């Protein structure tokens, strides 16, 4: 079921969010200011923005240009909605690492709630194909990434891709073509520890089109990183070498 409110009052929006945001996907468009406190500090002045709130606690804020959001919070964040004097606030709190996203809404143009179910996401291609893409354009991982060797053999196995970040830190990358699990995180951690002990510093990242909640929690606990492979797939959707199928999506 999908519900839509056009030009809702702050009072209407508050009750709508409290009723729906824990079970449905929420999208809203309105005039807002944003404050972020955590690993850094940022402030976004009053402007019209698109805000997406997912059932798992994810919050994403977009402006009118670029693919990447200007602010976001990951799954597992705690969301609190308050109706204050002349504004509606949405606060997203992440406990570890400690981060806080505070959105102050002064006007809403529309607000939607929808039941969205998960579908199958199949990628016709291997980890090798994805690594090939990264080797062609290392910045798909991050700016300044320098790949050194693929299938790098160490005592604990074969690393999919080894390189250095822009600061010269050894960077270990493990690629998965499907949703990453706890086993994938454990595998990456073994590789990461080898390079940490060998070089005194290291980074390790798991690259996949999805990750389980338990695996993501373990990634954060072990101070590893997760890279959403969908960012990479976005750049190749017009390539004949790959087919991306999203099926079994249920619509009400």
UniProtKB/Swiss-Prot annotation:
InterPro entries in alphabetical order: Endonuclease_NucS, NucS_C, NucS_N, NucS_N_sf, tRNA_endonuc-like_dom_sf
On the tree of life, the source organism's domain of life is Archaea
Where is the protein situated, by its record's location annotation? Cytoplasm
Instruction: Work out whether the entry's keyword set contains Disulfide bond.
Output: no
Keyword Coiled coil in annotation = no
Enzyme nomenclature, EC number: 3.1.-.-
The record's listing under HAMAP family reads: NucS
Q: Which NCBIfam families match?
A: PRK04247.1
Name recorded for this polypeptide? Endonuclease NucS
Naturally occurring in which organism (per UniProt): Sulfurisphaera tokodaii (strain DSM 16993 / JCM 10545 / NBRC 100140 / 7)
């Amino acid at each position: 079921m999908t519900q839509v409110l056009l030009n809702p009052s702050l009072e209407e929006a508050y009750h709508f969010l409290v009723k729906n945001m824990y079970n449905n996907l929420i999208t809203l468009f309105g005039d807002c200011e944003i404050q972020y406190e955590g690993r850094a500090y940022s402030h976004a002045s009053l402007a019209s923005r698109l805000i997406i709130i997912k059932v798992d606690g994810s919050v994403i804020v977009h402006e009118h240009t670029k693919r990447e959001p200007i602010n976001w919070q990951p799954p597992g964040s705690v969301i609190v909605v308050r109706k204050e004097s002349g504004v509606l606030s949405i606060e997203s709190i992440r406990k570890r690492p400690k981060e806080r996203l505070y959105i102050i809404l002064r006007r809403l143009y529309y607000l939607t709630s929808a039941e969205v179910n998960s579908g199958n996401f199949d990628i016709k291609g291997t980890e090798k194909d994805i690594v090939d893409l990264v080797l062609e354009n290392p910045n798909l991982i991050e700016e300044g990434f320098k790949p050194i060797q693929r299938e790098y053999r160490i005592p604990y196995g074969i690393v999919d891709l080894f390189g250095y970040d822009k600061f010269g830190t050894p960077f270990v990358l493990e690629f998965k073509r499907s949703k990453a699990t706890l086993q994938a995180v454990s595998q990456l951690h073994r590789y990461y520890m080898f390079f940490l002990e060998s070089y005194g510093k290291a980074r390790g990242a798991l690259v996949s089109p999805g990750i389980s909640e338990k695996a993501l929690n373990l990634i954060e606990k072990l101070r590893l990183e997760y890279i959403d492979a969908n960012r990479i797939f976005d750049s190749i959707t017009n390539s004949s070498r790959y087919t991306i199928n999203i099926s079994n999506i249920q619509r009400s």
